[in-house]
Amino acid sequence: MLRIILCVFIPLFFNHNNLSSQILKLSGGINRTWMNEKPFDTPCLTYTGSLGYDYLLYRDYHDWFYLSSEIGYIKRSGKNAITGSKLNMDHLHLNTLFKVKYSFENLMMSAGVGPSVDYRVIKGGQSNKLVFGARPEIGLSYFLSNRISLYFTVAYLKGFSGVESMMQADSSDKTFYNNSLLFTIGIGYRVKKKKINYWHYSSL
């Protein structure tokens, strides 16, 4: 399954000429993460980092939406409030989002949503290797020049599949679902030579 996902995602990620890719992004930040079930339902802070592309950012037939894909690392966790122990999981994170944008002067606001897939890179116990979910996100970009930009994003990861299963005293399995709230900052570099009209709306 992972090979199928990578075969679809990687050509999309790197084939920027055909998809009119515009901005290469590098980001990192913190992740407020918790499980949906006791005893690991107390939030704790971990970290995340990713490499991404924004593409279809500017076309002749539209100037209000674009696509964004990322591949990176995310640490999911949850804390036992009584014992202080944590349930930690390391994942390779992939997502592709459909985003709408509004630009004014040298700022751009965006909001988007799309599917995400996490692959457990260090497996133990009865954990699931693949976690499917959705990722809504909002962001703000500030353009330092025609090529360089800084941006800040807030994203929420909602898992549709469990990340861990544990045997209970009655021999039944409890499945844990993870929730993550990500706060990231990053830098973007425009790779296309064609000038992008970031300030299209400022002249309206």
Model segments located where?
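Bacterial Sec-dependent N-terminal signal peptides
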Residues: 1-27, 187, 191
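Outer-envelope beta-barrel architecture signal
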Residues: 20-24, 61-67, 105-111, 146-150, ...
